[in-house]
Amino acid sequence: MFYRFALLAVCLLTTRLAGATTIGSIQGTGAAAKPGTYTIEGIVTGLYTGLNPTGFYVQDEAASADGDPATSDALFVVQPDPTVAIGSRVRVTGVVQEDAGAPSFNQAVLIEPIITIISGGNPLPAFTILNNATFSAAALEQYEGMRVQFSAPLTVTDNYNLKQRGEITLSAEGLAYQATQFIDPNDNPSTGTTSTGSRNLAAGKAYQVINDNKVIILDDGSSAANPKPIPYLDATYHTVRVGGTVAGLRGIMGYGFGKWRLQPLPGPDAPVVKNVRPLAPPAFGPLDLKLVSFNVLNYFNGDGAGGGFPTARGAKTPADFARQRSKIIAALTQMNADVVGLTEIENDGTGANSALQDLVNGLNQAMGANTYAFVNDGGATQQPNNTDLIHCAIIYKPVAVALLGPTLVAPVPGVFERPPVAQLFITRRKPHADTLAFIVNHFKSKGSGSGIDADQNDGQGSSNDRRRGQAKALVQFINNTVIPAGAVKVVSAGDYNANYEEDPIDILRADGLVPATPPISASYVFKGLTGSLDHAVVTSNLVGFVDVQKWHINSAEPGFLEYDVAGEATDINSPFRSSDHDPVIIGVNFRGVSNALGGQANTRLFVYPNPAAGPATFSLASVPASAGILTLDFMLPQGPRLLSLRGTPKLLQSQLSRYTTHLAPGIYVLKLRGTRFEQTQRVMKE
C-alpha cells in the first residue's frame, strides 16, 4: 500500500490530473481573469496570512503552463486560515473573479476553495526576469501573481507610507523627478523665461506618464496598519532613504489599492534596502564666506520659559520641542556657516524669550559664547510688514562678517505672507573687505488657493499666481532697495516653493538673476517625486564665484524620524530629518570658484561618438574669440535642460567640471550660443 501511494505521488509530480485548467487560460490576455468555477493545479509560491484577504499564491509549473508569455500563470487563492505551505503542490477548485469588489480588489482571486495537497517540498517555478529598461507598470497584467525578479537595482522614490502601511515606492530608472524640475509649462526649450501660458503642458504630462510607468510598490506582505517592527530599515542607520537601492529584487507581483505591488518573499529572497547617508556636510575648497539657507520646520519655543505648549504650528509638548531644537542645532553646528538664513521660525520678535533668541542661545551654548548673533529687523514683538505666525530671519558670526547698514524687510504690504529679509555684510577674513547682500525668502506654499490661485493642473500646484507676484516683488526689492543700499553682489536664497522650471524662477531669470544649482540638485520630496523648492539665486556678477550644494539630511529621510512622530526613538543628536527641506549651502570665493575648488577631481567629458582618431576630451578651446560671452546649456538627449551657464569660454571650461560632477555617467547634449556662433555637441560623461 505504501509503495502504491509513493508511486502515485511521483506520477502526480509530473502529470497534471484530468479536469484541471491552466491558470494562464483563466487569466487570458485581457485586463481581467475570466470569471467562473475552475479546478487548477500548481505550486504554492507565497503564503500571506497578514493580507486582507488572507491566502496564498499558486503558479503553474512550467511543464504544465499554457506556454503563452502574454498570460499570467498564477493567481491568489483566498483562504482565511491557510493550510498549505510554500512548495506544496495543490489541486484547488473554486470560483475565480477579478473585479473592484471584495475580496478581489482588481486582483485575480479564487474564492470558496476546495483544496487538496498533493505533495510538499516541490521546486518553485523559476523567476520571470523583468528588464529595468523596458519595465512599464502599464504592462504588468501578464505577470500578475507570478514570481518575478528585476534585472538591475531599483531606486527608492518614496518612503511616505513606510511607517503607516509598511510600503515603499521603487523606480526602475532611478529617482523620479517633478516634471517642472526639468520641463517648463510655458517654454520649449525650457531655457525660455516666459512666466505665463500653457504651450508646453503636453511635454510635462508625458514626462509624468513616464514616471508613473516606471514605479512599483514594495509591500510588506501585510494589510496591517502601523506594522511593528517597521520593515526594510537597514541595520546601520535604521532608515529607508529616498535614493536608496534594492538589488536583485525578487517577489510576487500583486495588486491592491489601485497599484501594482511586489509582495516580499522570505529567507534569502527577502528584499534588502541599501542606504547611503551623507554623514558630513558637502565639502568645499577654500572659501571667503559660507552661507546657509535652512527651513527649520516651524521652530516655536512656546512662551520661552518652558510653557505655552502646544504651540500654534510647531511642537506640541516641551519634550517634542527639546528633540526638535537638538536636531536643528546639530545640523547648524555641523554646517558651521558664517551667515544663516532661517525660514519657518516663529514670528514673535527678538526679545529674550523669542524663538530666534532661543535658537541663537542654543547654538552659542553648543559652539561657544557669542558665536552667533541675529540681525535685528526692528520688530520687538513681531516682524515689520508680517502678520503671519512665522517669518524669515538671519543669524551670523560677528567674527566673520560685520553688518553694513540696517536690516531690510521688503516693504510690500499684501504681497508676501512672509516678506523677504535682507542684510548687507562686510567680510572680515580678507586683507581687503568685500561686501555681499544676503536675502532670505519664503514664498507662498503650493497647498491651497482659489480662483486664479487654484491649481491650474500645469504641475505648479496652487497659489502659483501668488508666487509669481512675489517673484516680481522680490525683483523690485533687490533693484530698488537692496542694491541702492550699497550691494553690488546679491545672494537671494530660501524656500521659493517653486521647482526649477516654474514661473517664479523664470521671473527671476528674466531679470538676469541666476539659479546657482542644476535641476537635479534637489531639496524636497512630495508624493514620490523629487524636486527643489529651495534655491540660491545670485546676481550674474557672482557666477563663477559661488559654489552651491545641498546637504541631503531631510528630504530623503522618512517622516517618522521627525521630532514629533518618532518620539523617544528619535536620535536627538542627529541632524537627519531635522526638517522636511534640505539646507542649501552657498560657498563664496571672491577670487573665483576655480581657485576655491582647485583640489577637486575633474569630471571627464568626451566628444561622442569617438572621433576616428580615438577618444577626445571635450574642450571649449576651439571656440572663436569673436563668439564673445557664451551661453552653455547641458541637456539630456530627451531634451530637458540640466544646467545653464554663461560666461567666457575660459570661465565656462573651469565651471563645467564642477557643475557636472553630480551627474550620472552617460550621454548628454551641449548647446553653445554666442555672437554669430552656435554649436551643438554630444558628450559622454565618464
Give the positions of each predicted feature:
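Sec-dependent signal peptide recognition
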Residues: 2-8
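Extended non-catalytic accessory segments flanking core domains
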Residues: 19-315, 319-330, 364-366, 374, ...
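C-terminal outer-membrane/trafficking sorting elements
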Residues: 598-686
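N-terminal signal peptide c-region/cleavage motif recognized by signal peptidases
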Residues: 14-15
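Divalent cation-coordinating acidic motifs and surrounding scaffolds
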Residues: 81-82, 168, 172-176, 225-229, ...
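Surface-exposed coil/turn segments at beta-strand junctions on protein surfaces, enriched
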Residues: 33, 85, 143, 211, ...
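Hydrophobic beta-strand positions in extracellular immunoglobulin-like domains
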Residues: 44, 96, 154, 253, ...
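Solvent-exposed strand-loop boundary residues in beta-sheet-rich modules
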Residues: 62, 398-399, 429, 511, ...
